[in-house]
Amino acid sequence: MSLPHNEHRQTSPLDILSPPPQIDILLPVKERFGPKNAGAVSGVVHDLILASQTPDLFNVFGHPVETPFDDVSFTPLTPHRAWFHGRNIGLAKAYLNHLNGRPDPALVEVHGRCHVAAHISAIRPDLPIALYLHNDPREMKGSDSVAARQKLIRSMAVVICVSDYIKGCFLDGLDVKDALSTKVVTARNGAHRWLQAPSQKTNMILIASRMVPEKGILECARALTQVLADKPDWHVKIAGARRF
């Protein structure tokens, strides 16, 4: 599980620990961790692991896929009694069952599912858990109230947000001067720079996003209508699924 030119990686402090710490990453149940149908979260997780100085320390857990990424450690899990618990909590229970008889990870990173992070913390309060947020948590189960977010922040080791906006959403209504608020941090998504020089550009705006209300596609379309009203040489393309 290594990148091309992996020998050029800088040495990480984690490399010298013995035994090396293991970091488990739990995906939302709808994510498909493979090159064919990877969602946005799967893509980000895959890229971040490969960009890490210690990619071999990560283990990704998620719904079974026919062909997972072959350059990152992946363990497929079938949600436990999804008919009763729901699919995401069922996946969390399958993960907890997987831990039985195995060494505990140094960190459990739960992506995008606040109620899953809370559930794992309630069952295994001894496990350090990082909640990784890609969207507004105020619309999510398990964090849609100030009280719920206060409870989350107490039980999480850290809350990682992909933007300052998402960080502000999580802290909305909370006392930002409280020491616990320092657990909420921003870690922006990166991108690999493929081009050595700027390419020639055309007057086109490309929007790659799910076409659903929570992604703000309607507000975006309305804004573009106003901005481009007197710019007939510009055009817009939108690429994205409607039901994912």
In which residue ranges do the predicted regions lie?
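Short beta-strand->alpha-helix junction loop in the catalytic core
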Residues: 137, 165-166, 184-195, 242-243
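Acidic anion/phosphate-binding donor-loop and adjacent secondary structure
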Residues: 141-143, 171, 185-203
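An amphipathic, basic-hydrophobic alpha-helix
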Residues: 81-107, 117
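Short His-centered aromatic/hydrophobic patch
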Residues: 109-116, 133
